[in-house]
C-alpha cells in the first residue's frame, strides 16, 4: 500500500536510514502542513531536462536520497543492458550540493558494479555529452539545474550517443526508478573501496584538450580572427558557472585578444551572489556585463548560463551607441546562415545537409535553409530531440547534420557532442562578428540584412509560474481548457490549423481534414495562424510554469512588433 504524504514525512523523520541533518530540517517544518505536503506529495519526475527540483529534504526535493534512488533505477537499467563495463561519465556545475550529488551518483553506480568516470571538478554540460561519446560510455549524468534560481538543482541523464535520453530509454529508466520503492533497495559504497576495485575513476584536465580541439574544428574562417582581433572587443560573463575556463581558452587559442571578463561573476559560486536568476534570457543578469561593456566600448557582450549550454548576446548599434539584446532566435540564425553560406562557398557543405530546430524556434530558419538547399527538420521542444535527429542521420544516412538550434539560447555546430554547447556558440558568434567587422558591419547590421533578405520574423514568449500542488493542477486545467475549447481566432489572426501533439493530430480548420503530426506524443498545442503567424502552448518540463510561444512575420520591425504584441495579448488574455 502506498503511503500518504504525512506517513512518508513521519518515516523520514524517524527512520535511521536518514541522517540527523535531514531529520532536523524536517522536524523544523512541524506545523507547516502545506510545506510538508509539497515536499512529500510526489516523487520528483523526469521532464524535458531530466530531474529538477528545489534542494532540500523530501521526496519532491533534490537531496542525496532522491539522487541515490534515481541512480539505482538507472543502474538497474544499465545492468539489464549489460552496460556495466562501458561505464557512466559524470559531470556537475557550480551549484550548491552539485559535487556531493555527483559523487553520490558515482558511488551508487559503483556499488552496482558499474564503472564511473567523474570529472575532477565542475565542467560544462556539453563536455559531458562529448565525454560519453569519447570514452565509449553507455550513459552519462550531469548534476545541474541549468539557469534556474539558486534554490534548485537537477540531474540529467544521457545515453551512449551523447544525447539526453529519449524514448524508449527515458520511459524504461522511469519504470526502473518507479520500482525502487524502498530505500533498502538502494546500494552505495565507500569511495576508497570503489577506487580500489577500479570502479571509481577521475577525468582530469587533459580531457579538456580533446574537447577544445573539437570546438576549434568547427571554425570556418580562422584566418580572419588574428586579422580582426586587435580591433574587436568582447565582454564575457560566465554568471558564476562553468563557462569561464573553456570559453576564454577557446577564444584565446583562436586568436581573440581583447576579451574582458566580468570580474565579479568570474568565480564559480552556487549562491549566484550578483544575480537573482543566472539566466542569459533575463535582462537583470546583464547589469554588470553592460557596465563593463560601456567602460571598454565592447563590440559584443556575451553571457553563458551556469552549466554553459546556453549563450546570451548583446551587440553594439554603432549608429545609436546603444547595446541591442539578441534573442536566441536571432543569434542562432546569424550563426546558421554564416555556416550554410560559408560552407557552401568553401565547398565543405556535406551532401543532403540538414538544419534542425525545435517547433517553437523561428520560422526564419525555413527561409534560410531553402536559400542554401538545406533540409529543415523540426523536432519537439528540448535539445535532446535535436541530438536524437543526429543519431537518426548517422543510422540512416538520410541527411548530414550541419547546425541545430532552439529559441531558448541553445545551439550546436558539429556532431562531436549531442547537446547544446555555449563554448562553441561563443566561438562561432565571435567568428561571425569578426567576419562582418572586416566588412565594416556589426552583428546588428548583419541581422538587419537578414531581415531585409528573408523577412521580418519576430518571436516572443510569455510564461506563467504556478508553484506547488495547486499550481500543478491549475496548469493541467489550463491545458484541458485549450483542448476542450480550441480558439478559432487569436487577436487579429484566424486559426488555420491546430496541432495537438499529445493526441498526435493536426486538424485543418477549413477542410476538417486531420493527419498525424509526425512527432512523438507530448503535451503541446500548436496553432498555425494566417499571415505566417503561429503560437504554441506547453507546460515546462522542468519548472512549475506554462509557456506561451508566439511568432509573426512583418513587413518591417515595427509591423512585426505590433503583430507580436497583439498575439501575446490575445493568448495571455485567454489564459487569464
Question: Where are the predicted features?
Answer:
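Gly/Ser/Thr-enriched, mixed-charge loops and adjacent short helices
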Residues: 13, 35-40, 44, 153-285, ...
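Conserved phosphate/anionic-ligand binding catalytic regions in large, soluble enzymes, centered on
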Residues: 40-60, 145-148, 234, 238-250, ...
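Short glycine-rich or small-residue beta-strand-to-loop segments that form or flank ligand, phosphate
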Residues: 87-93, 233-236, 412, 551
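Short Gly/Thr/Asp-enriched flexible loops that form oxyanion-binding sites at enzyme active sites
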Residues: 101-109, 152-159, 309-329, 365
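Glycine-rich phosphate-binding loop plus the immediately following alpha-helix
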Residues: 158-188, 329-352, 357-366, 422, ...
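Phosphate-binding and adjacent anionic-ligand microenvironments
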Residues: 294, 298-300, 322-324, 342-538, ...
Amino acid at each position: 500500500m502506498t503511503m500518504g504524504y504525512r506517513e512518508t514525512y513521519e518515516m523520514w523523520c524517524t527512520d535511521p536510514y536518514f541522517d540527523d541533518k535531514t531529520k532536523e530540517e524536517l522536524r523544523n517544518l512541524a506545523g507547516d502542513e502545506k510545506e510538508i505536503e509539497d515536499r512529500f506529495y510526489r516523487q520528483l519526475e523526469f521532464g524535458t531536462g531530466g530531474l529538477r527540483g528545489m534542494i532540500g529534504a523530501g521526496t519532491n526535493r533534490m537531496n542525496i536520497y532522491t539522487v541515490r534512488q534515481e541512480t539505482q533505477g538507472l543502474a538497474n537499467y544499465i545492468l539489464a543492458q549489460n552496460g556495466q563495463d562501458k561505464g557512466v561519465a559524470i559531470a556537475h556545475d557550480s551549484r550548491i550540493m552539485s559535487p556531493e550529488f555527483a559523487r553520490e551518483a558515482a558511488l551508487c553506480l559503483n556499488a552496482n558494479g558499474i564503472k564511473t568516470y567523474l570529472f575532477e571538478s565542475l565542467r560544462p554540460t556539453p563536455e559531458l555529452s562529448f565525454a560519453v561519446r569519447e570514452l565509449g560510455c553507455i550513459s552519462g549524468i550531469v548534476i545541474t539545474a541549468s539557469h534556474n534560481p539558486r534554490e534548485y538543482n537537477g540531474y540529467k541523464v544521457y545515453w551512449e550517443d551523447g544525447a539526453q535520453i529519449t524514448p524508449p530509454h527515458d520511459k524504461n529508466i522511469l519504470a526502473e526508478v518507479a520500482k525502487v520503492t524502498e530505500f533498502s533497495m538502494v546500494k552505495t559504497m565507500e569511495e576508497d573501496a570503489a577506487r580500489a576495485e577500479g570502479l571509481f575513476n577521475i577525468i582530469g584536465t587533459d580531457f579538456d584538450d580533446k574537447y577544445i580541439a573539437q570546438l576549434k574544428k568547427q571554425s570556418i574562417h580562422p584566418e580572419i580572427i588574428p586579422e580582426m582581433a586587435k580591433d574587436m572587443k568582447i565582454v564575457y560573463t560566465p554568471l558564476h558557472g562553468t563557462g569561464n575556463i573553456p570559453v576564454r581558452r577557446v577564444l584565446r587559442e583562436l586568436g581573440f585578444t581583447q576579451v574582458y571578463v566580468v570580474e565579479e561573476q568570474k568565480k564559480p559560486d552556487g549562491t549566484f551572489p550578483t544575480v537573482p536568476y543566472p539566466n542569459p534570457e533575463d535582462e537583470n543578469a546583464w547589469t554588470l556585463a553592460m557596465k563593463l561593456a560601456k567602460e571598454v566600448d565592447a563590440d559584443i557582450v556575451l553571457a553563458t548560463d551556469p552549466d554553459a549550454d546556453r549563450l546570451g548576446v548583446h551587440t553594439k548599434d554603432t549608429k545609436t551607441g546603444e547595446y541591442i539584446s539578441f534573442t536566441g532566435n536571432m543569434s542562432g540564425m546569424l550563426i546558421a546562415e554564416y555556416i550554410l553560406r560559408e560552407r557552401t562557398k568553401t565547398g565543405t557543405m556535406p551532401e543532403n545537409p540538414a538544419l534542425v530546430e525545435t517547433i517553437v524556434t523561428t520560422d526564419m530558419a525555413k527561409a534560410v535553409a531553402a536559400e542554401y538547399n538545406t533540409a529543415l527538420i523540426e523536432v519537439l521542444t528540448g535539445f535532446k530531440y535535436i541530438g536524437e535527429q543526429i543519431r537518426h542521420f548517422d543510422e540512416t544516412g538520410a541527411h548530414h547534420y550541419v547546425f541545430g538550434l532552439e529559441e531558448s539560447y541553445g545551439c550546436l555546430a558539429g556532431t562531436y557532442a549531442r547537446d547544446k554547447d555555449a563554448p562553441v556558440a561563443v566561438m562561432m558568434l565571435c567568428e561571425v562578428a569578426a567576419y562582418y567587422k572586416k566588412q565594416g558591419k556589426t552583428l546588428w547590421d548583419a541581422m538587419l540584412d537578414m531581415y531585409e533578405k528573408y523577412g521580418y520574423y519576430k518571436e516572443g514568449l510569455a510564461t506563467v509560474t504556478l508553484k506547488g500542488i495547486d499550481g500543478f493542477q491549475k496548469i493541467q486545467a489550463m491545458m484541458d481548457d485549450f483542448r476542450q475549447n480550441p480558439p478559432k481566432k487569436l487577436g487579429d489572426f484566424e486559426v488555420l490549423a491546430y496541432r495537438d501533439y499529445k493526441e498526435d493530430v493536426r486538424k485543418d480548420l477549413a477542410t476538417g481534414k486531420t493527419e498525424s503530426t509526425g512527432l512523438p506524443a507530448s503535451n503541446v498545442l500548436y496553432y498555425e495562424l494566417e499571415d505566417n503567424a503561429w503560437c504554441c502552448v506547453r507546460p515546462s518540463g522542468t519548472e512549475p510554469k506554462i509557456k506561451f510561444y508566439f511568432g509573426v512575420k512583418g513587413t518591417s520591425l515595427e509591423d512585426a512588433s505590433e503583430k507580436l504584441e497583439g498575439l501575446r495579448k490575445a493568448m495571455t488574455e485567454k489564459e487569464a
